[in-house]
Amino acid sequence: MKTIFRVDSRIVHGQTVNYWCRKYNVSKIIVANDELAKDDFRKLFFKIAISDEIDLEFLTIKSSINKEYDKTINCMVIFEKIDDVIKYVKEDGKINKIILSNIGYGEGKVKMSEGVFLNEKDKEKVSILQKDYGVDIVYKMMPD
């Protein structure tokens, strides 16, 4: 089976469940974010958005690297921001391809694709992921 890696600033929401999880038959979502892993209040809201058919787990970035993924299911690892992905690969996490989707507009950001806006620092980080870590970057709001 496979593991899909995504950056989504909204983390878990209707598009995640209704489109991404259905398209790739995902039965487990891991949210890799140090702050959220410790925030029980915020986690509760995300758990409400997920159907019981999908297992949702919140881990620190380091814990998500060391996590033994069930090879019999499709899993999605979601990062809230590109900084989390940089931390993941610097800690020896392996990512061949990551999908950037739902990174909102803000001051100094430019549109890279539908729903994905990056500032200069974000672009530099994407370049580091590509050049230094060999990560294939895909800009995609919705699955095909």
What are these regions (language model features)?
Residues M1-I50:
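Long, hydrophobic N-terminal alpha-helical segment
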Residues M1-K2, N25-S27, T72-N74, G93-I95, ...:
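Short coil/turn connectors at secondary-structure junctions
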Residues L59-N102:
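Ordered, amphipathic secondary-structure segments that act as subunit-interaction surfaces
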Residues Y24, D34-A37, D52-I61, C75, ...:
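Extended, low-hydrophobicity, polar/charged segments
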Residues F5-V7, V31, E57-L59, I98-L100, ...:
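General beta-strand structural signal in soluble alpha/beta enzymes
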